[in-house]
C-alpha cells in the first residue's frame, strides 16, 4: 500500500501560498500525474521463479521502494509492480520506472539511469535521490531474478545428474 508523509492534497501537489494568495507549483505535472495516477501498483508472489524483487531504501529520508519484475523465458520483462512508501517524487519515480521497464529485456533495463527518470519528471536537485532509488530498485530486481534462475537451473541440473 502506498503511503505518504504529507497529509494534505496541497502539500503533495507541491502548492505553496505566495504573499498574494496565489498557489505556486513546485512539482512538474509529470510528477503530479504519476503520483495521482500511479501505474503498476501492487505486488507479485515473491516465490514465483519468474519474479525478481528489488527492495531499496533511503535512510536519510525514510523512503522505501519495492519493485518487482515478471520475466518470460526469453528474458523479456512482461509485467511489473511496485509499492513505495515515501514522498510524491519517490512514488512518481517508481511509477515511471515500472512503465519504462515493461517490454524490455533484462540487459536493456540495466542501462536505465536515474538521470533519465529525473529529467523526465523534472525533479529538483533535492529530490534526485528518489530517481536513484528507482534505478537501484530496477538493478536489485534484475539481480534477484538472475539469482533465482541460477538456483533453479542448479537444482534442475542436480536432479538430472541423480536420474
From Swiss-Prot:
Tell me where in or outside the cell this protein is found: Mitochondrion matrix
The answer to keyword Kinase applying to this record is: no
In chain numbering, the transit peptide falls at: 1-48
Which InterPro entries is this protein grouped with?
ISCU, NIF_FeS_clus_asmbl_NifU_N
Keyword Calcium belongs to the record: no
Expression across tissues is: Mostly expressed in leaves, pollen and flowers.
Needed cofactors: [2Fe-2S] cluster
Q: Which pathway does this polypeptide act in?
A: Cofactor biosynthesis; iron-sulfur cluster biosynthesis
Cysteine disulfide partners in this protein: none
Ranges in a coiled coil? none
Report keywords, A-Z: 2Fe-2S, Iron, Iron-sulfur, Metal-binding, Mitochondrion, Transit peptide
What does the entry comment about cofactor binding?
A: Binds 1 [2Fe-2S] cluster per subunit.
- What GO terms fall under cellular component here? cytosol; mitochondrial matrix; mitochondrion
UniProt GO MF annotations? 2 iron, 2 sulfur cluster binding; iron ion binding; structural molecule activity
Biological process (GO) annotations held by this record are: iron-sulfur cluster assembly
The record's family statement is: Belongs to the NifU family.
Q: Per its database record, what is this protein's job?
A: Scaffold protein for the de novo synthesis of iron-sulfur (Fe-S) clusters within mitochondria, which is required for maturation of both mitochondrial and cytoplasmic [2Fe-2S] and [4Fe-4S] proteins. First, a [2Fe-2S] cluster is transiently assembled on the scaffold protein ISCU (ISU1, ISU2 or ISU3). In a second step, the cluster is released from ISCU, transferred to a glutaredoxin, followed by the formation of mitochondrial [2Fe-2S] proteins, the synthesis of [4Fe-4S] clusters and their target-specific insertion into the recipient apoproteins.
* Matching NCBIfam families: iscU (TIGR01999)
Quaternary data: Component of the core Fe-S cluster (ISC) assembly machinery.
Give the protein name, as stated in the record.
Iron-sulfur cluster assembly protein 2
Q: What high-level taxonomic lineage is stated for the organism?
A: Eukaryota, Viridiplantae, Streptophyta, Embryophyta, Tracheophyta
